[in-house]
């Protein structure tokens, strides 16, 4: 089994200088952030207070971006050896989630953030909404790596792949002299959210804590079958709430070839590199099991509800940061 990568779903300034380095020495190959993670870091960590005071008088979004960009740049530097040696070592930052339904503004923000950060191993996170597929295409076409996020349905994962791959094809066409130019091919991950499915549907399901795994397996099969190593499935929302499951449950159940799992710190600590790789189920096996657990209509409704809820949660977290600044 090859090309499995475990990333850390957490970022905070002082953490990057301490615990993060320890994680890197123990096999962590990347990191992700989102508005909720930055909200918790900026509003709860004292290290940001002096920085915020020095930035007073600026627009609140500008203050947020200076803080976030500084952390992302620091993480990118820590991860740079992995990027240049293994073509991994990415850190992700999300565009303003309030732009999720505006293609033009999303694309402009994504390019601006990438330019401001100015690190090759940064992925720009784009939510998988109808307005965003064109954004994913344009970023990949222009050599900017992408983390397509908030994927819940097979349809979303397919549309993400089509957009990302089309951009990748255009990038390659425009960079025929790739080796001479020393230009790196952009990478992409398609972030399939897992545990949120189970938390929503467990009360209606005939078997607990399986729907998220099966749904993620289905999306993974679709992505993996395309045989494009520069576009990987990433399993997100892999934290466990409560004590009914092992903290690393959603890591161990989704140890698949050419995939990424971004996990919270407690899940990483519980996992400790136990690489017992899984053989993905085939699609007919997945559908057979899913149909025994819950109806297709319930699953489809859950996909739509979870996407809407995920966007709303990130928008609220983003606005909470701005209000506090």
From Swiss-Prot:
Protein name: Transaldolase
Active-site residues, Swiss-Prot/TrEMBL: 125 (schiff-base intermediate with substrate)
UniProt keyword tRNA processing, yes or no: no
Chief localization: cytoplasm
Gene: tal
Keyword Cytoplasm: yes
Record pathway: Carbohydrate degradation; pentose phosphate pathway; D-glyceraldehyde 3-phosphate and beta-D-fructose 6-phosphate from D-ribose 5-phosphate and D-xylulose 5-phosphate (non-oxidative stage): step 2/3
Top-level taxon of the source organism: Bacteria
Enzyme class: transferase
Family: Belongs to the transaldolase family. Type 2 subfamily.
Keywords: Cytoplasm, Pentose shunt, Schiff base, Transferase
Organism: Campylobacter jejuni subsp. jejuni serotype O:6 (strain 81116 / NCTC 11828)
One Pfam family this sequence matches: TAL_FSA
């Amino acid at each position: 089994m090859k090309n499995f990568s475990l990333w850390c779903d957490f970022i905070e300034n002082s953490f990057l200088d301490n615990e993060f380095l320890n994680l890197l020495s123990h096999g962590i190959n990347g990191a992700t952030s989102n508005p909720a993670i930055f909200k918790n870091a900026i509003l709860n960590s004292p290290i940001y207070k002096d920085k915020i005071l020095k930035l007073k008088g600026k627009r609140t979004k500008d203050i947020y971006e200076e803080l976030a960009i500084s952390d992302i740049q620091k993480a990118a530097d820590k991860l740079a050896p992995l990027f240049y040696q293994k073509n991994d070592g990415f850190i992700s930052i999300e565009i303003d989630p309030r732009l999720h339904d505006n293609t033009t503004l999303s694309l402009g923000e994504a390019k601006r953030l990438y330019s401001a950060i100015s690190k090759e191993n940064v992925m720009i996170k784009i939510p998988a909404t109808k307005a965003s597929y064109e954004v994913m295409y344009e970023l990949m076409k222009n050599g900017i790596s992408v983390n397509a996020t908030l994927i819940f349905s097979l349809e979303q994962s397919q549309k993400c792949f089509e957009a990302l791959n089309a951009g990748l094809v255009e990038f390659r066409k425009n960079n025929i002299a790739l080796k001479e130019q020393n230009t790196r091919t952009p990478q992409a991950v398609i972030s399939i959210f897992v545990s949120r499915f189970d938390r929503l549907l467990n009360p209606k399901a005939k078997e607990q804590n399986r729907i998220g795994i099966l749904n993620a397996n289905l999306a993974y099969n679709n992505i993996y079958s395309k045989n494009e190593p520069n576009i990987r499935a990433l399993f997100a929302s892999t934290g466990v709430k409560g004590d009914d499951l092992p903290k690393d449950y959603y890591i161990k159940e989704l140890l698949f070839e050419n995939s990424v799992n971004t996990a919270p710190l407690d899940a990483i600590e519980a996992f400790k590199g136990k690489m017992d790789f899984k053989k993905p189920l085939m699609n007919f096996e997945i559908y057979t099991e899913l149909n025994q657990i819950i109806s297709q209509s319930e699953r489809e409704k859950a996909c739509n509800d979870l996407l809407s809820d995920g966007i709303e949660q990130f928008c609220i977290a983003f606005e909470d940061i701005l209000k506090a600044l």
